[in-house]
Amino acid sequence: MPVVKVRENEPFDVALRRFKRSCEKAGILSEVRRREHYEKPTTVRKRAKAAAQKRHAKKLSRENARRVRLY
């Protein structure tokens, strides 16, 4: 859990902004959205596999684009 200590003479909105930023860096909101509803293990594996395939395709396309460029 991110903790933000409010400094002396610091406006509330600045402290709130720092807290939101630390929550975003910690990934709390995305974790809450992910856990909002139960997801079957097969669905989790299927989604992870699809993400891995997408990353691999993106990597290959970047490598091919690098080879094609002939300056």
Swiss-Prot record:
Pfam families reported in the protein's UniProt record: Ribosomal_S21 (PF01165)
BP term (GO), one: translation
Keyword Ribonucleoprotein appears in the UniProt entry: yes
Superkingdom of source: Bacteria
Signal peptide: none
Presence of the UniProt keyword Ribosomal protein in the record: yes
Biased composition (Basic residues): 43-59
GO cellular component term of the entry, any: ribonucleoprotein complex
Keywords: Ribonucleoprotein, Ribosomal protein
InterPro entries to which the protein is assigned, alphabetical: Ribosomal_bS21, Ribosomal_bS21_CS, Ribosomal_bS21_sf
Composition-biased stretches (Basic and acidic residues): 60-71
Region (Disordered): 38-71
A GO MF term: structural constituent of ribosome
Family: Belongs to the bacterial ribosomal protein bS21 family.
Stated name of the protein: Small ribosomal subunit protein bS21
